[in-house]
């Protein structure tokens, strides 16, 4: 099985911010094959034999295989899966990407307006939007250049506070886009920030949340990878930091945190999408984020950390590294996860599954949630996989942004109200 990284190597052999031609996915299909006891090994063999990329790899029976099939392999692939059930996620992946990347031109007038959320946007427009949004609420927020990526891009953050003033309350930290291709997380974390700012003193629940917590929103944790998905390869996942093997740049930043770093939930292969890095915490962006989280924790601690991902419609708790270990706060984590999922579903009927990371999605080593809980002693550490469950996957149409934001806000508000109640 190739990683999505290998497609980028066909497009460009680069490890810097050089501009290259985008990889062309025209004619590629994304096909879901549900696995069962009698076919999971065969599906794994097909993926290996045809050297196919996957969005979801079936490690065991009952898991879906979401498979990227190039035009040259369509006939062979369809022959091999004959008799198995399948679902077409993208008939033409190139066309889906083209539709998704029709960015609307940014205007500063979008800052207080929901129109910003009708389209995806370029990295630089996100920076402009965050600065303009903060400029409308100067007494209750600040725009922060939280540090620089490996290629020198700003890692942006919005800091939001209420009646007590900044740095006066326990912190809530939201992370988005640690995996570059998960564009919906950029927009949803910005939707949360926009709502918390614009609805303060208008919505009683939001006002209470902002008054009770110092809120930090990091919409683009991995700016180099994010920019690369917009210029070169839409399906890039990792950062853009060089490795000893120059053909395979990048670390999976969510396998690079220095806690339970080695294990089956990450890879030592630089060409893997889950490459953990050469050393724990050696990712440029991870160093920046650890420093920021430690600084934030030094004020009044961190009440909650949420790392937003896509896709799968899941809301999950520790641990990623172990499928048997549970933190002492497991019951509280599960309770809040259920509250989040129930409130979210009430908005548009979107179902979310909940549970510990390892048991709910797969085993993960060196991830942000386990690190935040065990090393930084964050009280509550959680992660989400946003829309959808695979109908469109990573290439989620722009008309899904606003409903995703609406339901995620509802879940988040309900969960934080429960935290305030104790």
Swiss-Prot record:
EC number from the UniProt entry: 3.4.17.-
Residues engaged in binding Zn(2+): 179, 182, 309
Chief localisation class: secreted
Active-site residues, record numbering mapped to chain: 385 (proton donor/acceptor)
Pfam family, one: Propep_M14
Cofactor(s) required, per the database record: Zn(2+)
Subcellular compartments: Secreted
Domain Peptidase M14: 119-419
Cofactor note: Binds 1 zinc ion per subunit.
Propeptide part(s) removed at maturation, as residue ranges: 18-112
Molecular function per GO: metallocarboxypeptidase activity; zinc ion binding
EC top class, as a word: hydrolase
Family as reported in the entry's similarity comment: Belongs to the peptidase M14 family.
Protein name (record): Metallocarboxypeptidase A
Organism of derivation: Trichophyton equinum (Horse ringworm fungus)
Gene transcribed to yield this protein: MCPA
